[in-house]
Amino acid sequence: MGNDKRVRKPEWLKISIGANERYTETKRIVESHCLHTICSSGRCPNMGECWGKGTATFMIAGDICTRSCKFCNTQTGRPLPLDPDEPAHVAESIALMKLSHAVITSVDRDDLPDLGAAHWAQTIREIKRLNPETTTEVLIPDFQGRKELIDQVIKACPEIISHNMETVKRISPQVRSAANYHTSLEVIRQIAESGITAKSGIMVGLGETPAEVEELMDDLISVGCKILTIGQYLQPTHKHFPVAAYITPEQFAVYKETGLKKGFEQVESAPLVRSSYHAEKHIRFNNK
């Protein structure tokens, strides 16, 4: 995967992390409870903004993934056993942060018989038990398309369930380890058919065309997806899939307009958008 012709990062992608008291307090709570966040492990460009507002996306089931997607910075390897205290720790941290809306994601745990589904469900239930006024959004793996495992998450009743398509159909096999485009669509269909709001996210700048992005939008609409996030792919290290192009803010605006015209209820589309960016706005809109 040579990357001799690196694309220069444009000015609109240069950000300042910045820190305020809320950022420092959020960081303290996360570290004191030995929690993992996708904010830090995924090197999210919005960490300063989100932590500064007292929000964070918690990553459960450890911080070592059994898959090795070519776009992702999360560590790959043999994960440790699940921590039975983690659901309680996450719920307690949400209470300490006084979050009105919590976002949870996880690594893939293909090493476990149930792929981590029971741990997922227990975490959601514990959050709701300790924080009855807090709404939850969960960004789940594909659970290898096993409907009975996805049902465990659905039955825990989060307000929004998200599963990321990540990229267009043509590029998906090149960058998604052990994942399948059509399996992901079926995961989203199952979520939507349950009555829970279905959400998905994609990256652009991997070499896709606008026509392919529109095709992906059509596929998502056809299975009942209501919320879509679109952000610029940023290559974590030289070993990862190279950036093919930096998409302009103007093109992101076009994608947003196109998505809304196609029938999505909400579209977040901008260079620094990530899956959980402005998630608190999505739940407020969803509850109207």
Curated annotation (Swiss-Prot):
Assigned keywords, A-Z: 4Fe-4S, Cytoplasm, Iron, Iron-sulfur, Metal-binding, S-adenosyl-L-methionine, Transferase
Main subcellular location: cytoplasm
SUPFAM superfamilies tied to this protein: Radical SAM enzymes
Any Gene Ontology CC annotation: cytoplasm
Cofactor(s) recorded in Swiss-Prot or TrEMBL: [4Fe-4S] cluster
Positions bound to [4Fe-4S] cluster 2: C65, C69, C72
Enzyme type, top EC level: transferase
PROSITE patterns: RADICAL_SAM (PS51918)
Superkingdom of this protein's organism: Bacteria
EC code: 2.8.1.8
Known catalytic reactions: [[Fe-S] cluster scaffold protein carrying a second [4Fe-4S](2+) cluster] + N(6)-octanoyl-L-lysyl-[protein] + 2 oxidized [2Fe-2S]-[ferredoxin] + 2 S-adenosyl-L-methionine + 4 H(+) = [[Fe-S] cluster scaffold protein] + N(6)-[(R)-dihydrolipoyl]-L-lysyl-[protein] + 4 Fe(3+) + 2 hydrogen sulfide + 2 5'-deoxyadenosine + 2 L-methionine + 2 reduced [2Fe-2S]-[ferredoxin]
Transferase in keyword set: yes
Domain annotation Radical SAM core: ranges: 51-265
Cofactor binding note of this UniProt entry: Binds 2 [4Fe-4S] clusters per subunit. One cluster is coordinated with 3 cysteines and an exchangeable S-adenosyl-L-methionine.
A molecular function GO annotation: 4 iron, 4 sulfur cluster binding
Pfam hit, one: Radical_SAM
Biochemical pathway: Protein modification; protein lipoylation via endogenous pathway; protein N(6)-(lipoyl)lysine from octanoyl-[acyl-carrier-protein]: step 2/2
Protein localization: Cytoplasm
Positions that bind [4Fe-4S] cluster 1: C39, C44, C50, S276
Protein family (similarity comment): Belongs to the radical SAM superfamily. Lipoyl synthase family.
Protein name, per record: Lipoyl synthase
The species this protein was found in: Bacteroides fragilis (strain YCH46)
